[in-house]
Amino acid sequence: KKQPAIGIPFAGKLIELSEQGRLPDFMVRYGIRRLCKKRLKDEFISHPEYQQDRFQKLIEELRRSPIAIDTDAANEQHYEVATDFYLASLGKRLKYSCAYYPDSNTTLDQAEEEMLALYSKRAELDNDQEILELGCGWGSLTLWMAENYPRSKITAVSNSSSQKSYIDKLCRKAGFSNVTVITADVNFLELESAQFDRVISIEMFEHIRNYRQLFERISDWLTSE
């Protein structure tokens, strides 16, 4: 049986009501199934010419875009939320990204530490490096690096003034003098050329549109070695 079409304004209203907790569970599940079905249909139309055309249009759209969009909205939704909320819901490191659980007995605090150590291993971090972290969140990796590589200099970039304040406070408390936190929109971030040995960005790329432009800037910021 063909299901009746739901107009975009009406669908938007239903989503708003569901986010407010004003719809029963069965309606929320039904709506999710409909949206997923429609998305799958749109994404997997089998005609190769259609797929290629759609892919090329997406590439061109990304190339014409700024590095990131809706940065103010992201701040409002996530990054300028009171830090006390995240202190109550995240682990000890306040890691606002994935953790690594090597086994089922691993706690959240341990999983945060495991993930931070894994970043270090994969990025080949060490002392005496200049390290840039783009999208540092509440400083889980920045503070971990400052603690484990005291002879390295770390520059952390966040678009959130409350995140900067929180990291600066913890640096003062821990006596870290090797951390600089910059509040900046990545679209307008200006840094010296050939300054950094490592550039790290953890789960920030969901906000990025123009990957090419960002990678060009990162290439300029990295040292030649």
Each language-model region and where it sits:
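Conserved Class I S-adenosyl-L-methionine-dependent methyltransferase catalytic core
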Residues: 38-122, 126
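Conserved class I S-adenosyl-L-methionine
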Residues: 128-137
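Conserved SAM-binding loop of SAM-dependent methyltransferases across substrates and taxa
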Residues: 138-150
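Conserved SAM-binding motif I beta-strand of class I
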Residues: 153-158
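Conserved SAM-binding loop
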Residues: 167-168
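Conserved SAM-binding strand-loop segment of SAM-dependent methyltransferases
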Residues: 173-188
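A short acidic, Gly/Pro-enriched loop at the edge of an enzyme's catalytic core
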Residues: 188-199
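A short glycine-rich, Lys/Arg-flanked "PGG" loop and its adjoining helix->strand segment in the class I
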Residues: 212-225
